[in-house]
């Protein structure tokens, strides 16, 4: 057992109002500079829709994530090491700028400098790439906002698989939900596996995935390898960049910028302990519908004395263990089974989870709009948002986990409504979904009236315990045994011998001794 800690996030889609505050603040802090105008580390999509970039969830087109071979092993969908290397100079599956959008501003100066004339001057769009005026804007990061555009285009959404989607093009059957998206900081990141230069790494202390800007060579294979398309190429610097989970804030115990500024208070941050030795086993699960449950088995109970003892023995700080015990992410994902991972079928074991949307249905149910099931709760399967659509997004097509989460949220509402409105304690609904009174009241506190300290439980990092990483700078990415730490082999891709790597630490220590 190799115990590691990860700072995870849960987003409650039941409360997201689509205000884009998270997107704007993230943009202003991290990507408001030349070369990254089109990049949105955090963006809010309206579903159903093809997303950003266009058809980003279609892995048949973009070749992201992992696939399981017949021998039971997984490999990047993009190809093996040799297959990835052959795409270095010509990658046919990397999104182009038109798959995102041509970033633009408006010619505001013309409003002030235009000469006197018959007509009011207008501010025409101007490209932020070449500075030239654009004929018209044809796409954007939130082009499908509030179901913008015709249904025929939005119907290409991959989450409509196994659904008769034609009926949802009719006005009376239409539905909509918001989906904030950011880097998932996966336990099994495919972007790390597809980077030939070894520039992408996952931090052991908090699980945040970062790109070493010194080692990045701009091959852009990580962009193809990421199934969530949350790595962007900076055309100015020639490097790839991605969400850094605001790690300078996380290290000091503060939430990410998107979480801090969220108007709807939908975001929760907390620590999860997991067994790193079980990651490959979980990601290699044969059936895609079982991936969610296998990922849950990777996580460890922070209240288990044996887990605590082993974690301390392996160097996990005490404050991290205590934070894991109070983690809202663990409560929602593991205790209450409300939060689900985004597209577990990609086999990356994502660590940004989502509570499926339920609102607004109470008045609709009271008016008899929802058929009754055998128990107290109405038939969740008859909600306006198709359960199969949510399952395709959050549980690899398995409707069971989605129905369980929705029924538990509905039961919580039924129980709290009976207390506050009717003045009685009706436990029939929560008994039906297998929850206790204590669990439901705690769920209500976290989902409805949580304080700042409840939503964000982030331990400060122990930089004094970090080892000297300087000696690891001479590590490399893809290798055939002839380039890392002085090793050598007969095969060399570039037909030339490589000198042994120089251990800078030894040279420095020797110089200090002299």
Language-model features: where?
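Non-ligating segments of multi-cofactor redox enzymes
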Residues: 1-514
């Amino acid at each position: 057992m190799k115990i590691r800690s990860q700072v995870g996030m849960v987003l409650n889609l039941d409360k997201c109002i689509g205000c884009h505050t998270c997107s704007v603040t993230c943009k202003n802090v991290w990507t408001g500079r030349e070369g990254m105008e089109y990049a949105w580390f955090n963006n809010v999509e309206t579903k159903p829709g093809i997303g950003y970039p266009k058809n980003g969830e279609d892995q048949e087109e973009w070749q992201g994530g992992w696939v399981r071979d017949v021998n039971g092993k997984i490999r990047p969908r993009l190809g093996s090491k040799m297959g990835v290397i052959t795409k270095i100079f010509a990658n046919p599956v990397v999104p182009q700028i038109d798959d995102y959008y041509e970033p633009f501003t408006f010619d505001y100066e013309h409003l002030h400098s235009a000469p006197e004339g018959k007509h009011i001057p207008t501010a025409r769009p101007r490209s932020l790439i070449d500075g030239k005026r654009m004929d018209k804007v044809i796409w954007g990061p939130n082009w499908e906002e509030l179901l913008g555009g015709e249904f025929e285009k939005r119907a290409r959404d991959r989450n409509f698989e196994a659904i008769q989607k034609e009926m949802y093009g009719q006005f009376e059957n239409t539905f909509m939900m918001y989906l904030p998206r950011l880097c998932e900081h996966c336990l099994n990141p495919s972007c790390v596996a597809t980077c030939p230069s070894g520039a992408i790494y996952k931090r052991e202390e908090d699980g945040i995935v970062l790109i070493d800007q010194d080692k990045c060579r701009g091959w852009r294979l990580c962009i193809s390898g990421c199934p969530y398309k949350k790595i962007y190429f900076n055309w100015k610097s020639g490097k790839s960049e991605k969400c850094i989970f605001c790690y300078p804030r996380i290290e000091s115990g503060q939430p990410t910028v998107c979480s801090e500024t969220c108007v709807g208070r939908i975001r929760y941050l907390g620590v999860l302990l997991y067994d790193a030795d079980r990651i490959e086993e979980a990601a290699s699960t044969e059936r895609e519908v079982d991936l969610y449950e296998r990922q849950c088995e990777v996580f460890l109970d922070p209240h288990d004395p044996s887990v605590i003892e082993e974690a301390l023995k392996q160097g996990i700080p005490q404050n991290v263990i205590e934070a894991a015990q109070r983690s809202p992410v663990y409560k929602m994902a593991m205790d209450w089974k409300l939060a689900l991972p985004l597209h577990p079928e990609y086999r990356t074991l994502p660590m940004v989870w989502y509570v499926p949307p339920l609102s607004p249905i109470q008045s609709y149910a009271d008016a008899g709009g929802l058929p009754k099931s055998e128990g107290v709760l109405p038939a969740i399967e008859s909600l306006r948002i198709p359960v199969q659509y949510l399952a395709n997004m959050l549980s690899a097509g398995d409707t069971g986990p989605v129905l369980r989460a929705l029924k538990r949220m509905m039961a919580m509402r039924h129980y709290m409504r009976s207390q506050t409105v009717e003045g009685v304690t009706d436990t029939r609904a929560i008994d039906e979904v297998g929850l206790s009174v204590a669990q439901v009241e705690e769920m209500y506190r976290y989902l409805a009236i949580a304080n700042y300290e409840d939503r964000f439980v982030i331990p400060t990092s122990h930089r004094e315990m970090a080892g000297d990483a300087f000696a690891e700078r001479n590590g490399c990415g893809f290798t055939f045994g002839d380039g890392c730490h002085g090793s050598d082999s007969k095969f060399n891709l570039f037909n030339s011998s490589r000198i042994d790597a120089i251990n800078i630490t030894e040279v420095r220590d020797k110089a200090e001794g002299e």
